[in-house]
């Protein structure tokens, strides 16, 4: 392998020693590889090698730490192979697993474990789970506020009156929790809170002007005024153009004078708010001259007017937002809010102390505690300064160098911890820091990118004790991708917006080599196969959006209007699906680079090469996953949302809720309506409207209990026997009287009460048993008992997506186990725990279905994609507005500027914003926009070869107009005010991309999406409802009811006919008596149902039963007819399928016709002969592994089979059993040509396993019905006491209950997709008799039917053809539906 070639910048990073080194490493610059090489260089240095455990290597995540340790280990092993006698290197391998390659949390934890005694900490502490900690905080807060209410202090009640919600203290709780979170990012939380108290102790204008927030405001105002001045100068310049409106010049000069006066007067001093306020309140704009100017064009006039309007709006907004009141009014407001804000800060102090006490009581710590405990061990205060402790000094001697990865995500506490164990304070800087401030996206975790920027600006690029090295060469992406990213960010990323100026020094430069892809010069085509970055706008306006001449139009086939209504997200997902199909399956689909060592080539883009990035997953990933699957695109979404919203988890949680407290109408109703009980909507309403005094006032629980009790009472009356009579007098008469009495009472029952009561009786029997156990069982065992008693886990496993649903339930059991390890216990606390998770939107994400190794499109959040790379990146949701909720609260909070409240007079019921709130609000918005800008940078830099950005807009014309207004060709960067007003990613990218030839801007309309060349003309929604298992069950109930009605009608007609004399008087009583005497348990066949079976078993049993029925049915029927002549007609009517089977079965050969073969012992048989099943498996294995991309000859096939044998995939001795003539005939067939086309398009699927749930009622003439009938016939035909009633009462398909589901599993040989549906193919190697095709069809049509059912149910697509390919016959056999 060739030696790695490092760039000059990378080599500097590797070699630089004895200084604090900050490495600004751009995306894809190979920082991890460089860091590993630096470490290896340090431990293998010829001059002064060190041990690996003398380095402290701090990474951001455990995964990164694991990867780093693995890379270092591999590099050391490589060195050992080069120098096998090097004892030092061998020692490093031993030390590697004890070396400090760790996250900051793990390092702090090790500090605490080793030095807990220095801070008087119990070493047996446990790290609290997030949800457990959340419950603890909730309990502490609730107790604190309850005590404050009991005390009834006036200032507390005033605070609550002003800032709480009308029916809840939730806003106050949120304020306290957020202040607590901010305080934890500082070394000493209580001190930070005390600093915030000082913000409200201002008394004079001097006090106000000295605050940090006022200084920041004045700097911001000056920056905006300079931008207004530039705009004004631009307008003046236009008036001097030959076609400019010169009469406007006077007004513009007046505007310029106003702005310059604001900038250059005493208002620029530190005591300037009053002067600014006075100046803004006295601004008067001159009117534009109406004088005609013959050379002036309307376009220039409108341009000047637009610019002037922007200037006036800038000044007006500054005045309205910040200079809306004199200083005295401001001071008055600050005095008014002082008392309630001091109450809030006091509550936060109390909460912090009580929470610490509660955690100490439960011996718990959280990650914030771990950092602060480590800080207390390593740092102490002396004369107001932070200095290292003795422990820190000792530890600093242990480490030769401290290496910090992802330094841009550090906070102040971490900075103090790592600085304390460095040698910086002793004049020997030894800290290595690597990161990229442009990728700092963890503001919500209180990351402080300012730490990085302070050093970035202070450290020199020259040699010295504090040095900076920039790595800007990108080894990840194509030049086209990098050029477009640079083109965007050089216009939108500035020091004020994003934290760093996007200059040439920080731009991305291509460092990787890629094979060339042919450019698509036909820009009118809707299939772009080049690497040009795309910005797609989905125009949701009804009429067509106009498109600038400089843009390309995505020209898809014009189609008629479709009435389907889809949401914005669904339409956007459809647009993404269409683009993915074009990339993967289009005539000129996209190609990606395939690397094999140092060699690289192009390959067709696959689904696994594509990732869809989303800013937020909640609500978006579900929609995209669903739409992509509907479009036939496999999609994998590794989301941390959606778990608690899955049907199966919601159902189990609702059951747990009613186990804890049944008098909760909502969860109880959900359970009654679920398949666990199965009440219909009509039956639920019956519980509320059934006759009875006060029924409508009962709770659902009481009404259900009453209904079940009423049903039991009536049932007792029906089944209670009459007064005993001598059975010897007339047993037949007694039976008839009993039957008549029962029938009359049953008919008198209320139908609703019977049906509802029966279901409720079963429900309460299970519920009462579980509720008793819930008192003493742990939660996870309660859930398992619930599964055992109800079988609900098996039910959901039989539903579509059953594997994932069952995984979700198993995950719930695991969460219950984890909960039991916390400080909370019992069912009630577990439900509280879940409710809190739901309230704070903490979700676990569904258990995995597809995995990241499957050929599927990935859907993930931008945050989760950080550090990853993908050949094709689609950034969706470009038009989704940014979240600004934290800037719209009554009290806004900022880590640097503290608390910004509204001034509320609860007596006068008035409120107004304080200046402090306005300043903090503006800073929150700007900070959030800077964060969004960096998130966007992370998203775009994930792309290796193709970058696509897509979003929707209500009106593309308006969007384009806004972009034109905000952008000026050649001007870099965009105006700060433009960036500060951004509402979404379109607002950032659009103006930057508008005039950039490196980005293709495309518009789509909904009509372009509803029917493209891949659109399937199906009503997806209706198909989903049809395939819903609950709807299946409901349809079976209705079918059963209809059949029962028909049977009753037939019986009534039959009775009527018999009364006319067609049946003898004595025959019916005899028949009834014999039926009663031969009574069999009515649910015997249900008791025999297996939970799971296979398609092969069903087919095999079907064949066995066919033979058995054919042989016995006629004999039994003949025997019965001797005694009861009418039995022939009854059996034929009840089992027409058996009669049909007898008629269509092949004739049984006479004994003389049968070929008698001598029996040969197995050990004398030739080993090369394979049994039919083994030969079939061999053919299947070959067809599973063979490449279908080209035609095959017998020679090709022999070579391929030999390769399989050499690789151990098949037995070499089995090759002689292959008929290559028959095998090659398959590759010459028309079917293979279709398979080959599907394979090339990626639409061929081989050896696909499945598991589906099918109601046993649908498994007609198969295992459960026919086996029982065959067994009954066989047994009873040999029994002298045989009664024909037994045979006639054998179970038929309609005898099974609606909810009897059987799991059926199988493996489909092959299926492929064509434009109008799925083609199902089954390979058969069976020898075929005289009947040929008919024999194969009869033998396998039921098996194929189950395969078809599986594909319909699991893929939600139609099977248009079912084909058996017989290798014996060498032809395709089509099975009709």
UniProtKB/Swiss-Prot annotation:
GO CC annotation terms, alphabetical: cytosol; DNA helicase complex
The protein's required cofactors: Mg(2+)
Keywords, alphabetical: ATP-binding, DNA damage, DNA repair, DNA-binding, Exonuclease, Helicase, Hydrolase, Isomerase, Nuclease, Nucleotide-binding
Biological processes annotated in GO: double-strand break repair via homologous recombination
Segments forming domain UvrD-like helicase ATP-binding: 4-478
Gene3D superfamilies xrefs: 3.90.320.10, P-loop containing nucleotide triphosphate hydrolases (3.40.50.300), PCRA, domain 4 (1.10.486.10)
Region (Disordered): 1036-1072
Biased composition (Acidic residues): 1036-1065
Coiled-coil region list: none
Domain UvrD-like helicase C-terminal, chain residue ranges per copy: 526-867
Cystine bridges: none
UniProt xrefs under InterPro entries: AddA, DNA_helicase_UvrD-like_C, DNA_helicase_UvrD/REP, P-loop_NTPase, PDDEXK-like_dom_sf, PDDEXK_AddAB-type, Restrct_endonuc-II-like, UvrD-like_ATP-bd
EC number(s) reported in the record: 3.1.-.-, 5.6.2.4
Pfam family for this entry, one: UvrD-helicase
GO MF annotations, alphabetized: 3'-5' DNA helicase activity; 3'-5' exonuclease activity; ATP binding; ATP hydrolysis activity; double-stranded DNA binding
Catalytic activity: Couples ATP hydrolysis with the unwinding of duplex DNA by translocating in the 3'-5' direction; ATP + H2O = ADP + phosphate + H(+)
Sequence positions that bind ATP: 25-32
Family of the protein in this entry: Belongs to the helicase family. AddA subfamily.
Subunit description: Heterodimer of AddA and AddB/RexB.
Function: The heterodimer acts as both an ATP-dependent DNA helicase and an ATP-dependent, dual-direction single-stranded exonuclease. Recognizes the chi site generating a DNA molecule suitable for the initiation of homologous recombination. The AddA nuclease domain is required for chi fragment generation; this subunit has the helicase and 3' -> 5' nuclease activities.
Name under which the protein is recorded: ATP-dependent helicase/nuclease subunit A
